[in-house]
Amino acid sequence: MKDGFLKAAALSPALRVADCTYNTAQIIQQLREAAGRGVKLAVFPEFCLTGYTCGDLFLQRTLQQGALTGLQAILDASRELDVVTLVGLPLLARGKLYNCAAVLCRGQLLGLVPKTYLPNYGEFYEKRQFTPGSTEVETITVCGQQVPFGTLLLFRCREMPSFVLGVEICEDLWSALPPSTFHALAGATVIVNLSASDETVGKAEYRRALVENQSARLLCGYLYASAGHGESTQDMVFAGHDLIAENGTLLAEAAPFAGGRAETELDCQRLEAERARNTSFEPSADGYVTVEFSLTPADAVLTRWVDPTPFVPGDPKRRAERCELILKMQADGLAKRLEHAHAKTAVIGISGGLDSCLALLVAVRAMKQLGRPTTDVLAVTMPCFGTTKRTRSNAEILCDELHVSFTEIDIANTVHSHFADIGQDESVLDVTFENGQARVRTLELMDTANRTGGLVVGTGDLSELALGWATYNGDHMSMYGVNAGVPKTLVRHLVRYEADIAATAELKNVLLDILDTPVSPELLPAKDGEIAQKTEDLVGPYELHDFYLYYVLRFGFGPAKIFRLAKAAFAGRAEYPDEVLYKWLRNFYWRFFAQQFKRSCLPDGPKVGSVTLSPRGDWRMPSDAAAALWLAELEQIPLKG
């Protein structure tokens, strides 16, 4: 439960129809095993104490009493288990029979939630035996305990207030307006569904989509435990299809006929963060009763997959689709700005590196979209002290293959003159030596744009903006920054995608060589013709910084939790021991706070994903905010050795 992680399981034990004693033993055995694995929330199927396929036997008092006897046995067994447990049973109350979910923890029966929607079509005829649940919550006596009974019940963990449980039963999810919708608006972050959904052709896909979509709509975790082996096969077959989803993502699944156990960790903090930032999610808890319970805090071992590249889809087909969409968004943003400004040219400083390559590719797409010749793109290369033959050659080949206008301005003499003006000793390779070149390049681009009636296209990416890896009023400044919403890890894939669809072998080869070139600003003199200044040696690996950036901005997680996630995401990577992850996380926070002043005056640029740093849009932060709290939390992280 540390960091908001809740280990949860959806379980479908084998059972015998109407044999409550046998079924109870199976449930208790699986519950104990789950507790041994650290599970804190265990959900069993609808009518798991009796079996769903009892038919008119549900009307027999013997079966009803057998279910209550089984419930008492589970309550007794649960006293020594630190697990919130949900089981399904028929319950006679108010003189009517209800299809109920019993919620229990440590021997206490927390509540009984009746099913709202009773299917009475096709193979289902629940209205023959059962009555729909009422929204009115009242207290009844069950197993010698006074228990709240009704559909408007929520269950909150005292030790982890972000874990609030809501309950629905099978058909409730399949209805037009599921009870879980109201549960979520009332504060439930985790919805459980006790189900007995029979298997038919195509139903598993539909069921999976329902669970994923409902978890996305409600910004919640969703556990679905369905009846499996042992149910009567007189007219139906039950496959034990168990699912756990979180905000639209399927985290765990027991496929039909695969054994009936789905288990993973839900991130309740993440769900809270999603709801906090979504102002359309309006809380409404009218009529609800919340029951509190206690669990012993535990540090769950993470088994859920943590994506080391959260900005980049893992599936090749989906990644290609995402790349094409982003390129179209960038191009459309630039096309609109060129049109609005009546710009005759799009002026881009070309270095032979990744970012300027992507900006050039986007500018070419924009001109084609506007029906204008690609020669209206003016690429300017500005070699100086650190420029290598490799990057210079790649810049020229790229421009030639894309059929854009190309010019070279050697800025060495201008920089020499500038250094003489300000008294800079050229043997001192300090920040003035580096930034002076960047600012001269920006001067050349701005004036070239004025001369040609054009617009300067910025090349800096989201990762550089987060780290402040840009010269203030140098490459930091442009008239429209097309890459401002694109993180470095994604820049690589966008360029690779363009290489994959390249019209000529020459274009593909130069793009691949650019991808293979170390990331560098080339502001220090080259050594033996090779790049002497490699960005990732100085500020750290971009795949780490993009990972940190995602969780800092997207969910507002603290350093300790992000460090924990990074350890899980990069486990097995020898180049990333804990000390390295910690070093660059600390570096990220220090730079992120210290460099906000650059982000406070960014040029316009298109948002392409959920994370962006525009001071006019998604990220508003004072330039003089202190990082002390975040750095202090980092100091508390224990490191081995």
Predicted regions and their residues:
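Enzyme catalytic cores with a strong preference for nitrogen-chemistry domains
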Residues: 1-347, 365-374, 401, 406
